[in-house]
Each structure stands twice: as C-alpha cells, then as structure tokens.
Design a protein with these regions (language model features):
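Bacterial N-terminal signal peptides
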Residues: 4-13
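A conserved short alpha-helix in the GNAT/GCN5 acetyltransferase fold that borders
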Residues: 10, 101-104
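Sec/Tat signal peptide C-region and signal peptidase I cleavage site
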Residues: 14-19
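Periplasmic/extracellular electron-transfer cofactor-ligation site
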Residues: 20-51, 74-79, 103-110
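Extracytoplasmic electron-transfer domains, predominantly the class I c-type cytochrome c fold
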Residues: 54-101
C-alpha cells in the first residue's frame, strides 16, 4: 500500500511538472501567433520592431501589476497606435502571463 501511495505521488508530481511545461508552451505559441511580428517572445533576440519591448523585459513594469491578468482578458491595448487590441480567455491569459514570467531577465542591479 505504501509503495502504491508513493508511486501515485511521484506520478502526480511528474504530471504537474509536465502540465506547467505544456502551459508555457501554449503561452509562447499564443504570443508567437499574435505578437511576434513586433515583439521578441523568447529569452533572446531583439524585437523585430525596435519600439516594441521584448517580453522578457516586462518584469519591471507590467507583469506584476495586480490587474495585468484581467487586462489580458478584457482587451489589452497600448498607447502605440499600430498595436492591435488583444483579448484572451482566462486559460489563455494565464498561460501567456506564466510564460512571460518564466522568461524574464534578472532584475538590474539596484532594483528589486
């Protein structure tokens, strides 16, 4: 019985880790489809549009605002006139946000 319990826990933890990886993959796919024309969506490379910040640099501003997830669902838009408004359902918004958090650059020295 104990072996069965330990096996179940191990399987559950592996499945949980895989689901998180799958969520990150889904978030990246959404960003590639909707945003990569202007923004860099990965851990490296410059954005195709020099005025569009790479998503890996958002930690200092947007990602940790308490309402960022809600703004992704309500329709995220920018003051930049060429940027279209995007609206995500809750699952997609969470996948996008969690992927973006996973690729963030370390904070710059002297900042929290």
């Amino acid at each position: 019985m104990r072996c069965l319990l330990l096996s179940s826990i191990a399987l559950w933890s592996i499945t949980g880790a895989y689901a998180l990886d799958e969520e990150h993959r889904h978030g990246k796919e959404l960003l590639q489809k909707m945003c990569a024309r202007c923004h860099s969506v990965g851990r490296t490379s410059a954005s195709p549009n020099r005025q569009a910040p790479p998503f890996r640099s958002f930690s200092e501003t947007k990602l940790y605002d308490s309402d960022f997830l809600q703004r992704l669902q309500d329709g995220y838009s920018s003051i930049h006139p060429a940027m279209p408004t995007f609206r995500f359902n809750r699952d997609d918004a969470e996948a996008v946000l969690n992927y973006m958090k996973a690729i963030q650059e370390p904070p710059k020295p002297g900042r929290k």
